[in-house]
């Protein structure tokens, strides 16, 4: 299923439109996950669940991790096909910290520079919305993802070990990238849980 959503259009990346998805877009998002299972197989050791898209709209950070808003963003090409998605949390843990929970590009577009250009558009939009730093987690050993984020200018600040993700127990590298005049030390002074010595989950 491919159809442009009726929700709010956030920004464009060339001929690709980025839309703020809503619960009415669950079928097209679930179809996208099923057609592009690589992320779920690598991180969770299993294909996407039958309610994977639904969980993207319902999952929330723990109570001790305050946030402003969750955006589930769909990237649609000029033919109305969903070619990528991102889940973004604004002002997580502190003002100016934007967290990327998921960023998945259709497997058929891997190696073509599509992910890099879509991420650049996403980062620019986040900056316009007040992002000072972008934060995300990458599973240690998922070399493709690690290389991608490092090439985008992200640096590891800490590791979270022993996390149960689906069928697998993983170590997650917490990556941060300053996207304003505020640097990494400013970030670490503000977000205590991401300091290298932190024992917080």
Whereabouts are the PLM-identified features?
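Short, solvent-exposed loop/turn elements at beta->coil junctions and helix N-caps
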Residues: 89, 160-164
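Conserved beta-strand-loop-alpha-helix junction that forms the acyl-donor binding cleft
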Residues: 136-146, 163-168
């Amino acid at each position: 299923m491919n159809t442009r959503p009726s929700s709010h259009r956030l920004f464009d990346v060339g001929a690709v439109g980025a839309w703020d998805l809503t619960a009415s877009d669950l079928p097209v998002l679930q179809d996208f996950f099923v057609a592009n299972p690589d992320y779920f197989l690598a991180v969770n050791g299993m294909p996407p669940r039958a309610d994977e898209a639904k969980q993207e709209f319902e999952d929330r950070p723990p109570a001790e991790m305050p946030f402003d808003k969750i955006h589930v963003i769909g990237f649609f090409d000029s033919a109305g096909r969903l070619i990528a998605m991102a889940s973004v949390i604004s002002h997580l843990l502190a003002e100016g910290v934007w967290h990327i929970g998921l960023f998945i590009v259709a497997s058929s577009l891997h190696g073509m520079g599509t992910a890099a250009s879509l991420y650049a558009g996403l980062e620019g939009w986040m900056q316009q919305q007040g992002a000072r730093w972008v934060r995300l987690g990458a599973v240690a050993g998922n070399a493709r993802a690690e290389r991608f984020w490092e090439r985008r200018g992200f640096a590891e600040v800490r590791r979270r070990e022993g996390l149960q993700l689906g069928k697998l127990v993983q170590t997650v590298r917490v990556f941060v990238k300053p996207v304003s005049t505020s640097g990494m030390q400013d970030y670490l002074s503000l977000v205590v849980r991401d300091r290298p010595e932190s024992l917080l989950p």
